[in-house]
Swiss-Prot record:
Protein name: Bifunctional protein PyrR
HAMAP family assigned to the protein according to its UniProt record, in alphabetical order: PyrR (MF_01219)
Motif PRPP-binding per UniProt: ranges: 99-111
Gene name of this polypeptide: pyrR
Recorded catalytic activity of this chain's protein: UMP + diphosphate = 5-phospho-alpha-D-ribose 1-diphosphate + uracil
Superkingdom per UniProt: Bacteria
Keywords annotated in UniProt: Glycosyltransferase, RNA-binding, Transcription, Transcription regulation, Transcription termination, Transferase
Source taxonomy: Bacteria, Bacillati, Bacillota, Clostridia, Thermoanaerobacterales
Role: Regulates transcriptional attenuation of the pyrimidine nucleotide (pyr) operon by binding in a uridine-dependent manner to specific sites on pyr mRNA. This disrupts an antiterminator hairpin in the RNA and favors formation of a downstream transcription terminator, leading to a reduced expression of downstream genes. Also displays a weak uracil phosphoribosyltransferase activity which is not physiologically significant.
Alphabetized Pfam families for the sequence: Pribosyltran
Transcription listed as a keyword: yes
Binding site for substrate: T41, R42, D103, D104, V105, I106, Y107, T108, G109, R110, T111, R136
Length: 178
């Protein structure tokens, strides 16, 4: 895969996450019932960063959980008829909370749908909202993020690659060609 372009550097990522933090606080009139849930792998450090930015605004940090939806995905090969869920505990209570799912890139919407199914299995949230660092289009399901860092129209042959310090040792977003 060859890199076509760098679309976000470290400062652009920070600015987008700060804006998303402000939008979450504003839309929910504070963070009283807000819980952030990062979708592994890169959604988790993004959720933690957003929580830190929210704490600068509100004076306290919202709870942050993590969700591994690989066992819930409907588009995985079906080697097993029903995958076994080893652990459903995401580390935070979602009942009657405003759950903000955080992920790096939204594409078809299938990952988000699977994440919503997993959250609902854990309890009945007051609402589920979606924060994405990058929206690349090409949705296959009627899912739209509430908070978007950057809209990047892509072709289906392109890949958006988010790299974060916590996972990859660098902060940037690039477009690569398959």
């Amino acid at each position: 895969m060859r890199v076509k372009a760098e679309i976000m550097d470290e400062k652009a990522i920070d600015r987008a996450l700060i804006r998303i933090a402000h939008e979450i606080v504003e839309r929910n009139k504070g963070i009283e019932d807000v819980v952030l849930v990062g979708i592994k792998t890169r959604g988790v450090p993004l959720a933690k960063r957003i929580a830190r930015y929210i704490s600068r605004i509100e004076g306290k940090e919202p709870p942050v959980g993590s969700l591994d939806i690989t066992l819930y995905r409907d588009d995985l090969t079906t080697d097993l008829e029903q995958p076994v869920v080893k652990k459903k505990d995401i580390g935070v209570d979602v009942a009657n909370k405003i759950v903000v799912l955080v992920d790096d890139v939204i594409y078809t919407g299938r990952t988000v749908r699977a994440a919503m199914d997993a959250i609902i299995d854990l309890g009945r949230p007051k609402a589920i909202q979606l924060a994405e660092l990058v929206d690349r289009g090409h949705r296959e399901l009627p899912i739209r993020p509430d908070y978007v860092g950057k809209n990047v129209p892509t072709s289906r042959s392109e890949i958006i690659q988010v790299m974060l310090e916590e996972v990859d040792g660098v902060n940037k977003v690039v477009i690569t060609e398959k």
